[in-house]
Structure formats: C-alpha cells, structure tokens
A protein has these predicted regions:
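Conserved redox-active cysteine motifs that mediate thiol-disulfide chemistry
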Residues: 60-76
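A short beta-strand-turn-helix
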Residues: 36-56
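Short alpha-helix adjacent to the SAM-binding motif of class I
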Residues: 70, 77, 98-105
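Short, internal strand/loop/helix patches
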Residues: 104-137
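N-terminal targeting signals for export/organelle localization
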Residues: 1-38, 143-153
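Solvent-exposed loop/turn segments at secondary-structure junctions
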Residues: 62-66, 94-98, 119, 148-149
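Thiol-based oxidoreductase modules, predominantly thioredoxin-like and allied folds used
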Residues: 86-98, 109-118
Length: 153
C-alpha cells in the first residue's frame, strides 16, 4: 500500500505546477468516462462530486482491511499538498458504525470520508479494496491502482 500511495503521490507531485497533461488513460482504466460520481457522506446525504473543477482522487477502502488502515493516515498526512491539484475522497465499503469509529480514532478529520454506493462500485467495476482512482476533469480515468504493493519491491 505504501508503494501504491507513493505512486499516487508521485503522480500528484509530477503534475503539480506542470502545464503538461495526460492525453490517454492508463491501460488498466475503464474504457469510458463516468458521467457522475455520487456517494453517501457521513450524514447519509448523497453527494454528487463536481469533477470539472480539478482532477479527483478517490480511494475505495474498508476499515476491516489492514492495508487500508495503513494507507488512509498516510494519505491524510499528505492531503495539503495533494489537494492543491486534486479533490481527494476516501469512500468506504464497510459498516458505517465501525468505519466512523475507526475514522474518529485514527484520522484528524481533514480527509473527506464517505461511503461508496453499489451503483458507483458497479459502474467502476470495484470488486475489492483498496483501489485508488484518479479521474480527469472530463470523468476519464487517468490512473487506477489496485491493492497493496510491498514497498520493498
């Protein structure tokens, strides 16, 4: 997971202050753009993310998965830098009560936390977690990183 996060951070830092763009999505990305990104926030309200203002990093995670529990504090530590160029959202696919307990005990409240919907998971073919996806402002997938990659490889 640390290597996955490192790749995402590298991607974020490399595009920071750069006028270059990524012309084509990665090979592992979905073939079409998403029309909307809707999730449930921690109060139960459905939120439609504005993808047009800047690129969006979405991390699909679960509080019961150790590698996810390692990644989110690291993501939150680097949030100030990443959020200069990216909307950042962590969407849980786990029990709301246990997720919110874990979040309150392990995070500082800076990272936007929500819950993925079955429609969103189906449209993006999310079958497990952690999965990190970076969306361009047109809804196309620029980067899709699956699971844990040992940092010593």
């Amino acid at each position: 997971m640390r290597k996955s996060l490192a790749l995402i951070l590298l991607f974020a830092f490399c595009s920071y202050g750069s006028d270059s763009t990524i012309d084509e999505p990665t090979q592992s990305s979905a073939s079409s753009n998403i029309k909307e990104l809707v999730y449930e926030d921690t109060t139960g309200t459905m939120v439609n993310v504005d993808l047009t203002n800047k690129k969006t990093l979405v991390v699909f995670w679960a509080d019961y998965w150790g590698i996810c529990r390692e990644e989110l504090p690291l993501l939150e530590e680097n949030l100030a830098t990443i959020s200069e160029n990216y909307n950042v959202i962590a969407l849980a696919h786990s029990n709301k009560n246990s997720t919110m307990t874990w979040v309150s005990e392990n995070l500082n409240g800076e990272l936007e936390i929500g819950f993925s919907t079955s429609e969103l998971r189906d449209s993006l073919k999310i079958i497990g977690q952690p999965i990190s996806i970076i969306f361009d402002t047109d809804g196309s997938i620029l980067l899709r990183e699956y699971g844990y990659v040992p940092s010593d490889l």
